[in-house]
Amino acid sequence: HHDHHAAVGGGGGGGGGA
């Protein structure tokens, strides 16, 4: 997942946040 730009709290849905 490695979504640094996405919020850590929503890491599971980081793709949507980004």
From Swiss-Prot:
Keywords recorded for this protein, A-Z: Secreted
Domain of life: Eukaryota
Annotated signal sequence range: none
Claim: Secreted is one of the keywords in the record: yes
Tissue note: Expressed by the venom gland.
UniProt key word Secreted: yes
GO cellular component, as recorded: extracellular region
Subcellular localization, as worded in the UniProt entry: Secreted
Major location (coarse): secreted
Described purpose of this protein according to its UniProt entry: May serve as a metalloproteinase inhibitor during glandular storage. Their inhibition may be instantly disengaged, by dilution or physiochemical change, when venom is injected into tissue of the victim.
Other comments on record: Poly-His-poly-Gly peptide are encoded by two gene families: snake venom metalloprotease inhibitors and bradykinin-potentiating-C-type natriuretic peptides (BPP-CNP).
Stated family: Belongs to the pHpG family.
UniProt protein name: Poly-His-poly-Gly peptide 1
Phylogenetic classification of the source organism: Eukaryota, Metazoa, Chordata, Craniata, Vertebrata
